Every structure is written in C-alpha cells, then in structure tokens.
C-alpha cells in the first residue's frame, strides 16, 4: 500500500505519486501520471502507519507473527488525487505517459483484522492529500 508524507522524498523506488508531484510543482514542472490515471491506490498517511505499528506493539494480544494489512481499506484513483491537487494548484497541467510495465491497477488493504482489534485510521485519504498540497501552496513546513 502507498504510505505518503508531506516530507517524503521524491527519489527512490518507494516514492509515491504524491511525493513526485510535490517535487515537480516545487520545481515549476508538470507532474506526470503513468497510464490513464485510473489506477487505484490505498494511500495511508505516515502518521497512521506509525499509529498502527504502535497499536499492534502495545496490544495485549499475542499475534504470533501474523501479518496485517495496514491501510485505509479504501482507495483513490490517481486522477482523483490529481483533482485534489488542482484545488490548490489550478494552473498545474498534468502530463500522461505510457503505463509502467507490470503496474498494479488496484490496491486496497484488507483492514478487517486490525478493525476487529479496535484500530482504525485517523486521517482520511482526501484530508491527508489536501494537507500535503495546502502546506506546499502556503509554503508551510510539514
């Protein structure tokens, strides 16, 4: 799943579209979307990723090495993320490029196990993305 942060670096194999787009906007360049933008991603704010780990670490139940999906349990298309960005940067034009070979078109965390234990995300996808680009527009530290 895609963990994002307003301070995430846009380099490296795990950089999210959000981090890349923020960097391009800072540089006055057009952000790009690979493919048609209908890829759907479960995007999790880094604060929620940390809280989920702390929750599991401090939970009374012994998990015996069980794996849990940590995400929002919902997803958003890259085109929908683009629309949120354009709320803050209406003049930014996005370029579309060829799809990446092997790109996954749909991700969504199965959050049932964590929900049964009482954990849930605190930052909805749209709100977290809005905060990233609001801070970028206002040139506020994140």
Predicted segments with their positions:
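Flexible, glycine-rich beta-alpha linker
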Residues: 1-15
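C-terminal substrate-binding subdomain of Rossmann-fold SDR/epimerase-dehydratase oxidoreductases
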Residues: 23-142
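Short, conserved glycine- and acidic-residue-centered signature motifs
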Residues: 14, 18, 107
């Amino acid at each position: 799943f895609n963990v994002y942060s307003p301070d995430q670096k846009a380099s490296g194999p795990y950089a999210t579209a959000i981090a890349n787009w923020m960097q391009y906007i800072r540089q006055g360049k057009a952000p790009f979307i690979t493919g048609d933008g209908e890829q759907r991603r479960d995007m999790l704010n880094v604060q929620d990723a940390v809280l989920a780990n702390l929750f599991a670490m401090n939970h009374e139940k012994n998990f015996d090495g069980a794996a849990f999906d940590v995400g929002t349990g919902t997803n958003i298309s890259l085109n929908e993320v683009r629309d949120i960005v354009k709320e803050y940067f209406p003049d930014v034009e996005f370029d579309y490029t060829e799809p990446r070979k092997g790109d996954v078109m749909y991700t969504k965390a199965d959050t049932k196990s964590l929900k049964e234990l009482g954990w849930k995300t605190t930052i909805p996808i749209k709100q977290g993305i809005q905060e990233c680009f609001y801070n970028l527009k206002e040139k506020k530290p994140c």
